[in-house]
Amino acid sequence: MPQLDTSTWLMMIMSMFLALFIIFQLKISKHNFHFNPELTLTKTQKQKTPWETKWTKIYLPLLLPQ
């Protein structure tokens, strides 16, 4: 059974990591990041739910005999 030649694996793995590192650096360098982000307040409009617009009866809980 022939032996598997693993002498080039280290070079392949190292070159793969280097290539991935360069690719990710190029991708990240294209993004624009804001240096001083400020909060923007958005006005939220309150939507009325159906039970807020209608009158509903509120019942007392049933009285249990003591």
Curated annotation (Swiss-Prot):
Sites bearing N6-acetyllysine, chain numbering: 54, 57
Compartments in which it is found: Mitochondrion membrane
One term under GO cellular component: mitochondrial membrane
An example molecular function term from Gene Ontology annotations: proton transmembrane transporter activity
InterPro entries xrefs: ATP8_mammal, ATP8_metazoa
PANTHER family found in the cross-reference section: ATP SYNTHASE PROTEIN 8
Physiological role: Mitochondrial membrane ATP synthase (F(1)F(0) ATP synthase or Complex V) produces ATP from ADP in the presence of a proton gradient across the membrane which is generated by electron transport complexes of the respiratory chain. F-type ATPases consist of two structural domains, F(1) - containing the extramembraneous catalytic core and F(0) - containing the membrane proton channel, linked together by a central stalk and a peripheral stalk. During catalysis, ATP synthesis in the catalytic domain of F(1) is coupled via a rotary mechanism of the central stalk subunits to proton translocation.
Subunit architecture: F-type ATPases have 2 components, CF(1) - the catalytic core - and CF(0) - the membrane proton channel. Component of an ATP synthase complex composed of ATP5PB, ATP5MC1, ATP5F1E, ATP5PD, ATP5ME, ATP5PF, ATP5MF, MT-ATP6, MT-ATP8, ATP5F1A, ATP5F1B, ATP5F1D, ATP5F1C, ATP5PO, ATP5MG, ATP5MK and ATP5MJ. Interacts with PRICKLE3.
Family: Belongs to the ATPase protein 8 family.
Name used for this protein in its record: ATP synthase protein 8
Organism: Cervus elaphus hippelaphus (European red deer)
